From Swiss-Prot:
Belongs to the universal ribosomal protein uL22 family. This is Large ribosomal subunit protein uL22. It comes from Herminiimonas arsenicoxydans. GO terms for molecular function: rRNA binding; structural constituent of ribosome. Keywords: Ribonucleoprotein, Ribosomal protein, RNA-binding, rRNA-binding. One of its GO terms (biological process) is translation. HAMAP family: Ribosomal_uL22_B. This protein binds specifically to 23S rRNA; its binding is stimulated by other ribosomal proteins, e.g. L4, L17, and L20. It is important during the early stages of 50S assembly. It makes multiple contacts with different domains of the 23S rRNA in the assembled 50S subunit and ribosome. Part of the 50S ribosomal subunit.
Length: 109
């Protein structure tokens, strides 16, 4: 049995999100939540929210036992880029790229 949770359009770069996702892939959900709770990274709080949603989906929709769940798959894909400009010297402008990503979490036993 597998249950999914998806969060799209997160204002976090995919590279920074993958650093956190790689740490919890394949772990039991209680160990993964504990690791995410004490991680100082911005992506940890966001991924924790998605993981909690996947756990709630498994419990409510499939009647799964939380103690037996583990993170089957987790991946972070590139999302749309917001392009902004900032003023520079002599009338020039530089582009600022604000990255976003999509987070996909699957839990199962």
């Amino acid at each position: 049995m597998e249950t999914k949770a998806i969060l799209k359009g997160v204002r976090l770069s995919d590279q920074k999100g993958r650093l956190v996702a790689d740490q919890i892939r394949g772990k039991k959900v209680d160990a993964a939540l504990n690791l995410l709770q004490f991680s100082p990274k911005k992506g940890a709080a966001i991924i924790k929210r998605v993981l909690e949603s996947a756990i709630a989906n498994a419990e409510h929709n499939d009647g799964a036992d939380i103690d037996e769940l583990f993170v089957k798959t987790i991946y972070v894909e590139k999302g749309p880029i917001l392009k902004r400009f900032t003023a520079r010297a002599k009338g020039r402008g530089d582009r600022i790229s604000k990255q976003s990503c999509h987070i996909y979490v699957t839990v199962g036993n």
